[in-house]
Amino acid sequence: MRIKLLIIAFAASLLFIPQSQAQTSASGFPKGELSNAKNHTGNIWLSELNVGDSTFDPSIAMATYDAGAKLDWHIHPGGQVLLITEGTGYYQERGKPTRIVHKGDVIKCVPGAEHWHGATPNDTFAYIAVTPTAKGKTIWLEPVSDKDFSSVK
């Protein structure tokens, strides 16, 4: 009887966990907080897994996108590696064709490359981003045009 009461109490306590803490992605990492940054279109959640510092340089974050959400064009001075964990997305470097990326893909963004990434119009998208910070923070550029976003064949 005592075990049943403990189980009921535990289950009831789950109702009081804030939604942002209760949500996890399919990869098992926290979904994070809905971003209110001005450098994207659509809903994107961000969970900082490691804030880069002098001991552990790379910033590591989990990003989760609603269908059609995308980041603006941007540059990572130290490069970036994206480990795609869910869904289907787009990745494009300036002047190159847009690539369709899927769960399990690894994308290496070379230092200084202007690029963008986001979810396809009909699928959610998530990745773990590993971003060296010693050479500087992300440099944000202009929004991705509808032409660039819809040019995927």
Residue ranges and their predicted role:
Residues M1-I7:
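Bacterial N-terminal signal peptides that target proteins for export
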Residues I17-D57, T138-K153:
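A short, N-terminal "cap"/entry segment at the start of jelly-roll beta-barrel domains
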Residues W73, Y91-Q92, E114-T120:
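Short beta-strand His + acidic residue motifs that chelate non-heme Fe in jelly-roll/DSBH
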Residues G95-G112:
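Short acidic-glycine-tyrosine-enriched beta hairpin
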Residues N122-E142:
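A short hydrophobic beta-strand segment most commonly corresponding to one strand
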